[in-house]
Amino acid sequence: MDFITINSSNKTEEFALKQVVKQATSSLLYRLGKTIILASVCVEREPVSEDFLPLVVQFLEKSYAAGKIPGGFVKREGRAQDFEILTSRLIDRTLRPLFPKDYRYPTQITLMVLSHDIENDLQVSALNAASAALFLAHIAPIKSVSACRIARIGNEFIINPNTSLLNQSSLDLFVSGTKESLNMIEMRSLGQQLNALEEPLMLKALELAQKSLKETCTLYEEVFTPHQNELLFKESQGIIFNERLLDLLKNQYFDEIIKGIESSALSERENVFNEIAKKISEAHSEFSLEEIEWSLEKVKKTEIRRMIIQDKIRPDKRALEEVRPILIESDLLPMAHSSILFTRGQTQSLVVGVLGTDNDAQTHESLEHKAPIKERFMFHYNFPPFCVGEASSIGAASRRELGHGNLAKRALETSIKNKEQVIRLVSEILESNGSSSMASVCAGSLALYASGVEIHDLVAGVAMGMVSEGQDHAILSDISGLEDAEGDMDFKIAGNLEGITAMQMDTKMSGIQLEILYQALLQAKEARKHILKIMHEAKEKIVINFSHLPTTEIFNVAPDKIVEIIGQGGRVIKEIVEKFEVKIDLNKPSGEVKIMGNKERVLKTKEFILNYLHSLDQELEQYAIDEVLEAQVKRIVDFGAFLSLPKGGEGLLRKQNMDRCQVVLKEGDSIRCRVISFNKGKIALDLA
């Protein structure tokens, strides 16, 4: 066993090599304080024939890692939690660009949390553990990467804060990359205010992150290189194209290829290129269909990139900084609390808003928190197949859908003034040609306003792209699906006029320089201004229907009266909820009653509850201690009998009093009894 300790970027990491999981291609135990993560890499020796990178990253939390037993009926870890899925995506998006383009060997990277101290950053630790395990596996010429998190408290940036410091921060910036460049970025603003970060300050934070990554990656390479396995798979020369076929495509079919490039819809574009491939295959049998499709793809990609870099024009004829036409419609769904249809080019998001009560909040268990937490603001993103013209059924939410919903939530969360409000936004993507997550942000911000939710400001989102050839590059605003597929970067940025509230950057290159990222940030700001202007114009036309929106009424009663509102077996509260069609939250220790629903019904419910409690008090006032009554047995329970009293109300005759007098009662019997006490609104009886 080899044991390695690395000190960098405000933390001490320990790596135990060759101790466990020895049948994997590589494995290690990562330790940061009391946090221990098992990282393993397994590679199959037979490549797949499909044209994709067969990489799977799985991050798993174990409840025992925090000394817990899983909640719920089944005491075993089951379906992956959102945090596990989002962390898996975070690691995947960092590592995927590092692999050679023609790497086709199925590879599984597994991160299993065995022990965790909530003060440590699980995502940074997991990515660093995965990076080290992959570097040691040496399955291909892959650079070392690392991650860091940047917080901002006051005007000071902090590298790799612990959880306590992050909770005080106005910024949560997660960055990963090599010692030369950045691979992946996740950012969100934090706090009670909007806390949008200005572009120059964002650049300063990214520079600090780059410095930290350079230090850590340099140490990783120095320390881990002597422990690497032998290189398993060398990078090949890639696909060898038939020059005669390429010339044929450029000379005889170029106009048709351009027509396909200019087709805005994915399904339409695929049909055009399928027809071209079929036509060539029939006319030139010496070329295989696969060979033709590969060559078509190469000519298409080369021409798109040439148009953008040399001609400064895009496939849909837009200028590089131009945003597609925007149309915003509101109040489409009469029964929802809000609905906004946001259309940008051929991307369309319908965001529906619904307000709820505390009982509607989503409860999560995670190693990141000591106790289950309540998620009060939910953003759910759905990408049905029909939005891109695909004929397939709708299933459970995919990793991508969870990721896009989380990004939109992060963009909008700090814009909400009242963080205690329970809000669910759902984005239904009805049509997609790129930037659907950013369309969801724009529609979501307006949906919050239309729901009567108080917000600090509107938030808009735009997806930026980049095409790079040698020393030349071009930054694109509001990228389409084709530009996303053929470009080198997908940089989603959301914010208001002052700054950024959330961003996410992925790249297909081995990394991107800070100068290019800053150029993209400034260009995105101009695009955001344009979008926000249209959104503010749409906001002025929104009429909030307050009579339809749910209202919340909060009042207090004596804590011992809460049981009266609940009733035996919940009978009373069920009747109230069914009668008035409202939602009720009760707090037993404080006596707080929270009613939510239609304003008129809420007020009637409050009046009913107060009158009901008053009537119970009046019933008690009619009786005196030691008063003898003729009562009737209403119902028999394990601990005694409830008796209907002659002047209204009921009292409890306990079982021990019945046993003492050797009395056997049945429902409907009449019996003489005596009032012995009043306890928390209840009348206690004894046999007279």
Curated annotation (Swiss-Prot):
Residues 626-688 form the S1 motif domain. SUPFAM superfamilies: Eukaryotic type KH-domain (KH-domain type I), Nucleic acid-binding proteins, Polynucleotide phosphorylase/guanosine pentaphosphate synthase (PNPase/GPSI), domain 3, Ribonuclease PH domain 2-like, Ribosomal protein S5 domain 2-like. It catalyses: RNA(n+1) + phosphate = RNA(n) + a ribonucleoside 5'-diphosphate. Transmembrane segments: none annotated. It is found in: Cytoplasm. InterPro entries: ExoRNase_PH_dom1, ExoRNase_PH_dom2, ExoRNase_PH_dom2_sf, KH_dom, KH_dom_type_1, KH_dom_type_1_sf, NA-bd_OB-fold, PNPase. PANTHER family: POLYRIBONUCLEOTIDE NUCLEOTIDYLTRANSFERASE, POLYRIBONUCLEOTIDE NUCLEOTIDYLTRANSFERASE 1, MITOCHONDRIAL. The gene is pnp. Belongs to the polyribonucleotide nucleotidyltransferase family. Its cofactor is Mg(2+). Keywords: Cytoplasm, Magnesium, Metal-binding, Nucleotidyltransferase, RNA-binding, Transferase. This is Polyribonucleotide nucleotidyltransferase. One of its GO terms (cellular component) is cytosol. Mg(2+) binds at D484, D490. The keyword Translocase does not apply. Residues 550-609 form the KH domain. The keyword Nucleotide-binding does not apply. One of its GO terms (biological process) is mRNA catabolic process. One of its GO terms (molecular function) is polyribonucleotide nucleotidyltransferase activity. SMART domains: KH, S1.
